[in-house]
Every structure is written in structure tokens, then in C-alpha cells.
């Protein structure tokens, strides 16, 4: 699939890399399965960068519209599951 990750020009390079890492974990969950701990750690870091609910919803909705992968549903499943691998 060809799409761009949602970005904020105020993020540092490190923050942008960490946000992309979170979205890549979401992609992994849909495409081949993602390690639950890595996914949740990437989400925690994402929330440090994007602490507000409104901005999180905007960025995740943009990613979902472009990729068809839902960060919200992926994180929800990871939080509710005790499985080591999250597969959407």
C-alpha cells in the first residue's frame, strides 16, 4: 500500500520516528501479527508525544483513512488480550 504517515511539523525527528514506529506496529498487527508488548510500548510512547485525545483521534483517523488499519481497535484488542501476538 502507498500512503503517508500522519505528521506534525512541531515534532522532533525522534518523535516522528517513534510515531511511525507505533503505526508500523499497527500495520504488523494487520499484516502478520504484532508482539503485544512492543505494540503497547509503542502506544505508550505515542501517547507521550500526542497526549491529547482530540489530536490522537485526528491523527489516528487520518492513518485509518489512508491505510484502512485502525489504531484504536488494535490497541483496544492488545489491552484486552493476554496473547503474546496480536493479529487483526
UniProtKB/Swiss-Prot annotation:
Natural source organism? Bacillus velezensis (strain DSM 23117 / BGSC 10A6 / LMG 26770 / FZB42)
Xref: InterPro entries:
BH2638-like_sf, UPF0223
Which lineage is the organism of this entry classified under, starting from the top rank? Answer: Bacteria, Bacillati, Bacillota, Bacilli, Bacillales
Organism superkingdom:
Bacteria
* Entry-linked NCBIfam families: PRK04387.1
In Swiss-Prot or TrEMBL terms, this protein is called: UPF0223 protein RBAM_014500
The family note in this entry says: Belongs to the UPF0223 family.
Amino acid at each position: 500500500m502507498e500512503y503517508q504517515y500522519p505528521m506534525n511539523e512541531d515534532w522532533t525527528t525522534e518523535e516522528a520516528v517513534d510515531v511511525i514506529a507505533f503505526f508500523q506496529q499497527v500495520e504488523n498487527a494487520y499484516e502478520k501479527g504484532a508482539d503485544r508488548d512492543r505494540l503497547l510500548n509503542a502506544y505508550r510512547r505515542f501517547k507521550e508525544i500526542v497526549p491529547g485525545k482530540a489530536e490522537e483521534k485526528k491523527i489516528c483517523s487520518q492513518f485509518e483513512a489512508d491505510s484502512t488499519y485502525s489504531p484504536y481497535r488494535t490497541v483496544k484488542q492488545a489491552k484486552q488480550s493476554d496473547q503474546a501476538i496480536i493479529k487483526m
